[in-house]
Amino acid sequence: VTGANGNLGSATLAALRARGVAATGGSRMPGAGMRRLDFDDPTSLDLTEVSTLVLVSAGYAEDDQVVGRHAAVLDAAVRDGVRHVVYTSLTTAGDHLGFALAHRATERLVQAGGLPWTILRNGLYAELFGGLLRWSGSGVESPFGDGALAAVARADLADAAALVAADPARHSGRVHDLVGTPITAGQVADRLGVPHRTIGLGEYRRRLLEETPGLLSFQPPMLASIATGIRHGFLDGTTPDLTDLLGRPARDPLATAVAAASATRPKTSA
């Protein structure tokens, strides 16, 4: 499992081990029992004795760097005898998002690489949705308006990846679109017991550029595209793929988003 120190990678690794699957993680800064896998250092990409590779997207960069990283890992997988690749991609409904092209380009690489493959088109996290609400005075603000997001709890996506990786042949050549139940910013605010105020997309872009320190150059357009997609109803479609794969109901994305928003609540607003 690549990206094993990240949120999705670590949860996927834990889910595999909970199922009794012999699994190891790879990371640029590996913990105990992990392999060093630095996507920017091809000499570190040792995948010998790996039967199934769960390639967690290395999306925290510009598109060309992301695709280059993924290509290097996939080349190593072919070289070292990996027998199946599972790639965590982006939901089909996200084709218009600012970071979609790196995912679709990687899907092409996966499908053309000569190894059996499965693609998991993951919906946007409920944790992300809740975390993007901004506390202001006695309530929350967002650029989402009344638009809904078919959000997914990260833990469900980790469980889905573990299920596929534990029995990859069953899912060979398949693309699973893993989205959840549509939720709105207003619903999150209601659960929190506070009002929700919509801000314009132009104001949101201005805040990203002028009032949000620490963002890298690719992040403002990425976040703005998410806001536009949610606001105008491009990310609210759902499919049964997630629950069919899990064999159980999905975790409540609204409760997950509420918990994420609550975690950023200023003490003075409590």
Put a short name on every predicted segment.
Residues 189-233, 269-270:
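Terminal hydrophobic/aromatic helix or amphipathic segment near a protein terminus
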Residues 2-24, 40, 51, 58-68, ...:
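Oxidoreductase cofactor-interface core, primarily capturing Rossmann-like NAD(P)-dependent enzymes
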Residues 35-51:
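Conserved Rossmann-fold cofactor-binding substructure of NAD(P)-dependent oxidoreductases
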Residues 23-31:
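Short, polar loop motifs at secondary-structure junctions
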